[in-house]
Amino acid sequence: MTRNEIRPIVKLRSTAGTGYTYVTRKNRRNDPDRIVLRKYDPVVRRHVDFREDR
């Protein structure tokens, strides 16, 4: 297995509808479903949920 198969690069898109994204890696073995992280969105200047975008 290559490195990219185990820990692929994923985009996290803001649920506030601003279009702001973060880019991160995820471990498929620990998180087989889509990731949801609470991070800062500078467009709306507050913390919002960011969901994995495929």
Swiss-Prot record:
GO cellular component, one term: cytosolic large ribosomal subunit
Gene3D superfamilies: Ribosomal protein L33
Gene Ontology molecular functions: structural constituent of ribosome
A Gene Ontology BP annotation from the UniProt entry: translation
Entries under InterPro entries matching the protein: Ribosomal_bL33, Ribosomal_bL33_CS, Ribosomal_bL33_sf, Ribosomal_zn-bd
Pfam families assigned: Ribosomal_L33
Gene symbol of the encoding locus: rpmG1
Protein name as catalogued: Large ribosomal subunit protein bL33A
PROSITE patterns: RIBOSOMAL_L33
Keyword terms, alphabetized: Ribonucleoprotein, Ribosomal protein
Family: Belongs to the bacterial ribosomal protein bL33 family.
